[in-house]
Swiss-Prot record:
Subcellular localization: Cytoplasm
Protein keywords: Amino-acid biosynthesis, Arginine biosynthesis, Cytoplasm, DNA-binding, Repressor, Transcription, Transcription regulation
Disulfide pattern: none
Family membership: Belongs to the ArgR family.
Name of protein: Arginine repressor
Entry's Gene Ontology BP terms: L-arginine biosynthetic process; protein complex oligomerization; regulation of arginine biosynthetic process; regulation of arginine metabolic process
Keyword Amino-acid biosynthesis tagged: yes
One Pfam family it belongs to: Arg_repressor
Function: Regulates arginine biosynthesis genes.
Pathway: Amino-acid biosynthesis; L-arginine biosynthesis [regulation]
Gene name tied to this protein: argR
PANTHER family the UniProt entry points to: ARGININE REPRESSOR (PTHR34471:SF1)
Amino acid sequence: MRKRDRHQLIKKMITEEKLSTQKEIQDRLEAHNVCVTQTTLSRDLREIGLTKVKKNDMVYYVLVNETEKIDLVEFLSHHLEGVARAEFTLVLHTKLGEASVLANIVDVNKDEWILGTVAGANTLLVICRDQHVAKLMEDRLLDLMKDK
């Protein structure tokens, strides 16, 4: 199966079922006679723009552009390696390759307090409206990250 067709199949599966692990996705692909390695599947998920959300004590994959409105700070806290602040800008450190996916989620779910994002490979800049908002977000992120 071609990559484009495989991506379409994965998107279809994600919209029809709440799949929590790459293994579940891989098993569903195999049921459609599509065999992929874990490495290929990871790359596919990143290219498609899938991320995990936690809702009602369930964790499952969703397409980034189809995420429901979420508690952005709580969501980010589950995906960050570190947080720093420079005046009105938050510097969020992620695992390699996750910053751009998280930037898309922030952009889809942002409110009037967030102006925009800039993403690198493992660093996400969140530009807040002012220093006060950045400080509030930083404090809440650090609090939530302590509990992980």
